[in-house]
Protein backbone atom coordinates (compact mmCIF):
# COMPACT_ATOMS: atom_id res chain seq x y z
CA UNK A 1 0.00 0.00 0.00
CA UNK A 2 2.84 2.41 0.81
CA UNK A 3 4.44 1.74 -2.58
CA UNK A 4 1.17 2.46 -4.42
CA UNK A 5 0.64 5.68 -2.44
CA UNK A 6 4.21 6.79 -3.20
CA UNK A 7 3.70 6.13 -6.92
CA UNK A 8 0.45 8.16 -6.98
CA UNK A 9 2.12 11.10 -5.22
CA UNK A 10 5.12 11.01 -7.59
CA UNK A 11 2.90 10.98 -10.69
CA UNK A 12 0.76 13.84 -9.35
CA UNK A 13 3.85 15.94 -8.62
CA UNK A 14 5.20 15.26 -12.11
CA UNK A 15 1.95 16.34 -13.77
CA UNK A 16 1.75 19.51 -11.69
CA UNK A 17 5.36 20.38 -12.54
CA UNK A 18 4.70 19.86 -16.24
CA UNK A 19 1.52 21.96 -16.16
CA UNK A 20 3.33 24.87 -14.52
CA UNK A 21 6.23 24.94 -16.98
CA UNK A 22 6.55 27.83 -19.48
CA UNK A 23 5.82 27.58 -23.18
CA UNK A 24 8.14 25.40 -25.22
CA UNK A 25 9.92 28.33 -26.84
CA UNK A 26 10.89 29.53 -23.35
CA UNK A 27 11.98 26.16 -21.92
CA UNK A 28 15.65 26.16 -20.95
CA UNK A 29 17.74 23.32 -22.33
CA UNK A 30 20.28 23.90 -19.55
CA UNK A 31 18.70 21.23 -17.33
CA UNK A 32 16.64 18.04 -17.47
CA UNK A 33 14.28 16.20 -15.12
CA UNK A 34 12.80 12.69 -15.47
CA UNK A 35 10.12 10.78 -13.57
CA UNK A 36 9.91 7.16 -14.79
CA UNK A 37 8.13 3.89 -14.32
CA UNK A 38 10.67 1.07 -14.38
CA UNK A 39 10.67 -2.55 -15.61
CA UNK A 40 13.54 -4.55 -14.12
CA UNK A 41 14.99 -8.03 -14.74
CA UNK A 42 17.47 -9.07 -12.01
CA UNK A 43 20.47 -11.28 -12.74
CA UNK A 44 21.44 -13.16 -9.59
CA UNK A 45 20.95 -16.49 -7.80
CA UNK A 46 18.51 -15.13 -5.23
CA UNK A 47 15.71 -13.60 -7.35
CA UNK A 48 15.58 -13.68 -11.16
CA UNK A 49 11.95 -12.82 -12.04
CA UNK A 50 11.22 -9.55 -13.86
CA UNK A 51 8.73 -7.04 -12.44
CA UNK A 52 7.36 -3.56 -13.01
CA UNK A 53 7.38 -2.53 -9.33
CA UNK A 54 9.84 0.33 -9.62
CA UNK A 55 10.40 4.04 -10.29
CA UNK A 56 13.30 6.28 -11.25
CA UNK A 57 13.98 9.99 -10.63
CA UNK A 58 16.67 12.00 -12.47
CA UNK A 59 17.81 15.62 -12.51
CA UNK A 60 20.80 17.12 -14.29
CA UNK A 61 22.41 20.35 -15.47
CA UNK A 62 24.36 20.91 -18.69
CA UNK A 63 27.93 22.15 -18.32
CA UNK A 64 28.17 22.43 -22.12
CA UNK A 65 25.48 22.04 -24.83
CA UNK A 66 26.22 18.29 -24.84
CA UNK A 67 27.61 17.27 -21.43
CA UNK A 68 25.62 17.21 -18.19
CA UNK A 69 26.08 16.09 -14.62
CA UNK A 70 23.24 15.24 -12.29
CA UNK A 71 21.82 13.06 -9.54
CA UNK A 72 19.50 10.07 -9.49
CA UNK A 73 17.58 7.79 -7.17
CA UNK A 74 15.49 4.76 -8.07
CA UNK A 75 13.91 1.77 -6.38
CA UNK A 76 12.67 -1.63 -7.42
CA UNK A 77 11.14 -4.76 -5.89
CA UNK A 78 11.40 -8.22 -7.47
CA UNK A 79 9.63 -11.27 -6.06
CA UNK A 80 10.01 -14.99 -6.71
CA UNK A 81 8.27 -18.11 -5.44
CA UNK A 82 10.52 -21.09 -4.62
CA UNK A 83 9.05 -24.60 -4.48
CA UNK A 84 9.41 -26.80 -1.42
CA UNK A 85 12.92 -28.06 -0.78
CA UNK A 86 15.27 -28.85 2.08
CA UNK A 87 16.98 -25.65 3.24
CA UNK A 88 20.06 -25.95 5.46
CA UNK A 89 19.86 -23.06 7.92
CA UNK A 90 22.96 -24.11 9.89
CA UNK A 91 25.27 -27.13 9.99
CA UNK A 92 22.82 -28.80 12.38
CA UNK A 93 19.46 -27.33 11.34
CA UNK A 94 17.40 -27.84 8.19
CA UNK A 95 13.81 -27.14 7.20
CA UNK A 96 11.60 -28.47 4.40
CA UNK A 97 9.55 -25.56 3.08
CA UNK A 98 8.60 -23.36 0.17
CA UNK A 99 9.57 -19.67 0.11
CA UNK A 100 8.40 -16.31 -1.16
CA UNK A 101 11.57 -14.36 -1.82
CA UNK A 102 11.78 -10.61 -2.29
CA UNK A 103 14.62 -8.30 -3.31
CA UNK A 104 14.28 -4.54 -2.81
CA UNK A 105 16.98 -2.37 -4.42
CA UNK A 106 17.53 1.36 -3.81
CA UNK A 107 20.46 2.84 -5.78
CA UNK A 108 21.35 6.54 -5.70
CA UNK A 109 24.24 8.71 -6.79
CA UNK A 110 25.57 10.91 -9.60
CA UNK A 111 25.06 10.85 -13.38
CA UNK A 112 27.35 11.84 -16.25
CA UNK A 113 25.39 12.34 -19.48
CA UNK A 114 26.22 13.08 -23.12
CA UNK A 115 23.40 14.48 -25.26
CA UNK A 116 23.86 13.38 -28.89
CA UNK A 117 21.39 15.84 -30.48
CA UNK A 118 19.89 19.07 -29.10
CA UNK A 119 16.37 19.27 -30.60
CA UNK A 120 12.82 18.07 -29.91
CA UNK A 121 14.35 14.56 -30.00
CA UNK A 122 17.29 14.28 -27.60
CA UNK A 123 19.03 10.88 -27.68
CA UNK A 124 21.74 10.43 -25.06
CA UNK A 125 24.12 8.03 -23.34
CA UNK A 126 24.79 8.17 -19.61
CA UNK A 127 26.74 6.52 -16.81
CA UNK A 128 25.43 6.39 -13.23
CA UNK A 129 27.71 5.81 -10.23
CA UNK A 130 26.82 5.63 -6.57
CA UNK A 131 25.74 3.35 -3.75
CA UNK A 132 23.00 0.74 -3.51
CA UNK A 133 21.00 -0.44 -0.52
CA UNK A 134 19.48 -3.88 -1.08
CA UNK A 135 17.06 -5.66 1.27
CA UNK A 136 16.73 -9.43 0.88
CA UNK A 137 13.82 -11.24 2.52
CA UNK A 138 12.20 -14.68 2.48
CA UNK A 139 8.80 -15.65 3.90
CA UNK A 140 8.19 -19.29 4.87
CA UNK A 141 5.34 -20.64 6.98
CA UNK A 142 4.69 -17.77 9.42
CA UNK A 143 8.37 -16.78 9.59
CA UNK A 144 10.61 -14.30 7.82
CA UNK A 145 14.37 -14.17 7.31
CA UNK A 146 16.09 -11.07 5.93
CA UNK A 147 19.38 -9.29 5.36
CA UNK A 148 20.42 -5.67 4.72
CA UNK A 149 23.29 -5.07 2.30
CA UNK A 150 25.19 -2.09 0.91
CA UNK A 151 27.42 -1.90 -2.15
CA UNK A 152 28.94 0.20 -4.93
CA UNK A 153 26.60 0.79 -7.92
CA UNK A 154 27.33 1.37 -11.61
CA UNK A 155 24.84 1.63 -14.50
CA UNK A 156 25.35 2.53 -18.19
CA UNK A 157 22.17 3.82 -19.86
CA UNK A 158 21.00 4.77 -23.34
CA UNK A 159 17.81 6.74 -23.87
CA UNK A 160 15.89 9.51 -25.59
CA UNK A 161 13.77 12.49 -24.54
CA UNK A 162 11.05 13.75 -26.87
CA UNK A 163 9.32 17.12 -26.42
CA UNK A 164 6.25 17.16 -28.73
CA UNK A 165 4.01 19.53 -26.73
CA UNK A 166 3.89 23.31 -26.43
CA UNK A 167 4.04 23.32 -22.61
CA UNK A 168 7.57 21.89 -22.57
CA UNK A 169 6.67 18.55 -21.00
CA UNK A 170 7.92 15.51 -22.92
CA UNK A 171 8.38 11.76 -22.86
CA UNK A 172 11.41 9.79 -21.73
CA UNK A 173 12.45 6.22 -22.61
CA UNK A 174 15.67 4.45 -21.63
CA UNK A 175 17.30 1.03 -21.45
CA UNK A 176 19.91 0.23 -18.83
CA UNK A 177 22.20 -2.36 -17.30
CA UNK A 178 23.25 -2.10 -13.67
CA UNK A 179 25.80 -3.81 -11.46
CA UNK A 180 26.46 -3.58 -7.73
CA UNK A 181 28.83 -5.13 -5.21
CA UNK A 182 26.11 -6.06 -2.68
CA UNK A 183 26.58 -9.44 -1.02
CA UNK A 184 24.19 -11.23 1.34
CA UNK A 185 22.72 -14.60 2.30
CA UNK A 186 19.16 -15.48 3.34
CA UNK A 187 17.84 -19.01 3.97
CA UNK A 188 21.09 -20.51 2.73
CA UNK A 189 20.92 -18.71 -0.64
CA UNK A 190 23.66 -16.23 -1.45
CA UNK A 191 23.32 -13.08 -3.56
CA UNK A 192 26.73 -11.94 -4.76
CA UNK A 193 27.21 -8.84 -6.95
CA UNK A 194 23.72 -8.68 -8.50
CA UNK A 195 23.12 -7.28 -11.97
CA UNK A 196 19.98 -5.97 -13.67
CA UNK A 197 18.66 -5.27 -17.15
CA UNK A 198 15.76 -2.85 -17.41
CA UNK A 199 13.62 -0.35 -19.27
CA UNK A 200 12.25 3.03 -18.18
CA UNK A 201 9.29 4.99 -19.53
CA UNK A 202 8.11 8.28 -18.12
CA UNK A 203 7.89 12.06 -18.30
CA UNK A 204 10.66 14.50 -19.16
CA UNK A 205 10.84 18.19 -18.22
What is the predicted function of each stretch?
Residues 1-28:
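Cleavable N-terminal export/targeting peptides
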Residues 46-52, 99-105, 145-153, 190-196:
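Transmembrane beta-barrel outer-membrane domains
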Residues 77-84, 96, 159-205:
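Predominantly the C-terminal beta-signal and adjacent terminal strand-loop region
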Residues 34-42, 74-76, 128-132, 176-180, ...:
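Outer-membrane beta-barrel pore domains and translocons
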Residues 28-34, 68-70, 124-126, 170-174, ...:
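Residue-level detector of the transmembrane beta-barrel scaffold of outer-membrane proteins
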Residues 58-140, 151-154, 162-167, 205:
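Gram-negative (and chloroplast) outer-membrane scaffold detector with strong preference
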Residues 21-63, 68-69, 204:
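Short glycine/proline- and aromatic-enriched beta-strand/turn motifs that initiate or cap beta-hairpins
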Residues 43-51, 81-88, 135-144, 183-190:
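Outer-membrane beta-barrel translocator domains and adjoining extracellular loop/strand segments
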